Every structure is written in C-alpha cells, then in structure tokens.
Amino acid sequence: MHFSDTHIGYRSLTLDEREQDFYDAFHEAIDIALENSVDFVIHTGDLFDTWVPGNRAIREFRNAVMKLNARNIPIFVIFGDHDRPRRNGEPAAGIFDFMGVHVLGWDAYEYAVRKFDGEDVLIGGISNMKGYMKTRLKDEYKRSENIEEGYRNRILMSHQAIDPFFVPDQCEAKMDDLPMNFSYIAMGHLHDFMERRIGPLISYAGSTEIKSENEINGYLKQGKGVNIVDISNGEVDLQRIRLKSVRPQIRVESDADNYVHEISEKLSSLRVKDNEKKPLVGLEIHGDISMETVMQDISKFDNAIFSRPKIRKDPKIPNIHTETADLREYFRAYLGDERLADLAMKIMAHSRSKDIDGIMKEIEVLYGDNRQDSPD
C-alpha cells in the first residue's frame, strides 16, 4: 500500500477536533492495509506534521506500527519537507526500526531489497530535497537509475513537486528528470491524487486529510484515499481506495447580507456517505460587519463546525466627479496623502515607459523620507 502526507500531529489554533481527524484518517489507512493483506507499506513523506512531533503523535504512530508488525508487514518511509530532521536531529519514525520501520533516503538515494511471494522487490527512496539541496536532486535521480538494474520489480519513493503536476516555477524537477527504469514511482508532497503512466506508473497518493482550503475542490471530486499497488514481474496495477473518515469541508465566500443563506445552501447540498462528522466550513465575508455578529450567526448552525471566519472590509472608492477631477485627485482622495498621490503619479509614468529602475528609485526616496519622519 502506498499512502502519503498524513501530517499526524497537525493542530488547529481554533478547533481541537482537527488533530483527531488526522489520526482517524491515518488509522483508517493502516486498517485498509491490514484488510487487504498487503505485503508491505510505503509512506512518501510528511508522516508527521513537524520533525519534532508531540508525544501523542508518536504514540498514535507506534500503535499503528504495532498492528502492522503483528502481521509481519514492514513499512518503508521517506521524509517530506515538514518532517525532515534539521541538521543533527533524529527522525521520530526511526526509533521504531526494531518494529519493521525502515527510513530511506535521508540525505541521498537509498534502497532495500526484499522478497515477497517469491519475487525480489527493490524499494528505493529519496527524501525531500529543496533549497540548497535542490541541485543534488537530479543527480540522485540519475544515481537511482544506475543502481542494481537487474531487479524487475523496482519502486522509487520521492517527496517533490514535479513539473507538469504542479506550477513549474515551484517545482524541484521535471518529469524528464525522473528515472525511467522503475516499475512504480510513488510520489508525495502534492495533496491531490494523481496518476500517469510515463513508462513507469507515477502516482501522487495525496494527503489523507484536507489540510488546506485549496484541497476542497479535489476532495469533492475524488475524495482522499490510498493506493493499493500490485507489482509482479515488472507490471503494475493500481487500485484506489477512498477513506471514509475524512471530515467534509466546504468554503463559502459571500457578502455581509447573504453569507448565512449561502452557508445553508452549501450545507444542504453536501452529500457525503458513511461519514457522521460535521462538515467544516471556511467562511470569508466581504463587507462591513463585525466579528461578533458573524460569530453569533454561525453559532446557530448545529450541523457544522467553523474555522475562524475572515472578514474583508472592501475599501470605499471615493466619489469624485470625472468632469472636474484629474487622475492625481483620484489618487489623493483614495490614498489620503499628498506624497503618496505624487508617488502614484510618478510610478504610473515610469510604468508606461517600463522604467523599473525609476520605480524603485521613487520608492527608495519615499522610504528614506518615512524613516526620517519616524521617531527613534
């Protein structure tokens, strides 16, 4: 079984229920592995939400490992950007090595070979490499391609953003950089499930819980889940199993007059089977309304829980008669400051001529003036 980005130990500043949600999803994934009698489990990074997890997170992981170990099911893990140890730190998962936990690829590509059902399986791993380590990543991919080519069943574990699965300028590598002589490339880091056959089958298993509102659309389309992967004689088949314990989430963006109605509409249209958890609502309101009023309104919903609402008080555009006003008057009325109005006019002039240096000089002058005006 391949799963990823469990982020156990994650804690919300406002909702105690959220920490338990991540444990629930993690344990459901482990139960799926047991129910399907898998030979081994791989986890592709961000097992914990931080590299120094709390006692409860470690205990929950230990309990899961004990269930796997009782069935002689090893688990192979790599580090993500959240749980990668800093400098000389020790990995939390590594303390359970005596119970079948194998940490791979801390600082470089590393692999292990195990025999399952009479077939050798090479399991290799490269933990997250970004920042100053990014330049080494492509070299490690190449090194993995040149090691022990005799094995037909080859799995690579990696925790990176790969172009074209993510925004190119935020990726550490491109698909062409990946080694092509693996049977299955198990990815972590991106929280939505994705798969593509590029020679080897490559798949992001996705996260097991919704950690960001950016994941809600993906969750509504395909849920959260784990990959049950059958690999034999170099051939790979993937079965996706959805998790049922994931707390449903919706996002409501509305104005001060309509947000209550829109919350009701979205909650009534939400259909999630086999899940008794109350949906989590992320709310953003545009307009002039007090937080106290909003909190009173949402407290009336006993069928949902809410993260802290966001109130965006949209700026009021000054009403100036166009026939008598020039552009500088607009800037002065809107910004409320003569110097800022002058700066806006100068920046606009530089922008028209694409004079970036001129823009920066104007800002530096203003910054210097503000420093002189500020008290020590």
Curated annotation (Swiss-Prot):
Record-linked InterPro entries: Calcineurin-like_PHP_ApaH, DNA_Repair-Maintenance_Comp, Metallo-depent_PP-like, Mre11_archaea-type, Mre11_N
Active site: H82 (proton donor)
Activity regulation text: Nuclease activity is regulated by Rad50.
Record-listed Mn(2+) 1 binding positions: D5, H7, D46, H191
Gene3D superfamilies xrefs: 3.60.21.10
Co-factor remark: Binds 2 manganese ions per subunit.
GO molecular function, one term: endonuclease activity
Keywords: DNA damage, DNA repair, Endonuclease, Exonuclease, Hydrolase, Manganese, Metal-binding, Nuclease
Residues holding Mn(2+) 2: D46, D81, H159, H189
Cofactors named for this entry: Mn(2+)
One Pfam family of this chain: Metallophos
The enzyme's E.C. designation: 3.1.-.-
Gene Ontology annotations of biological process type: double-strand break repair
Protein task: Part of the Rad50/Mre11 complex, which is involved in the early steps of DNA double-strand break (DSB) repair. The complex may facilitate opening of the processed DNA ends to aid in the recruitment of HerA and NurA. Mre11 binds to DSB ends and has both double-stranded 3'-5' exonuclease activity and single-stranded endonuclease activity.
Subunit structure, as described in the record: Homodimer. Forms a heterotetramer composed of two Mre11 subunits and two Rad50 subunits.
Family indicated by similarity: Belongs to the MRE11/RAD32 family.
PANTHER family cross-referenced by the UniProt entry: COMPONENT OF ATP-DEPENDENT DSDNA EXONUCLEASE, NUCLEASE SBCCD SUBUNIT D
Name the record gives this protein: DNA double-strand break repair protein Mre11
Name of the gene encoding the protein in the UniProt record: mre11
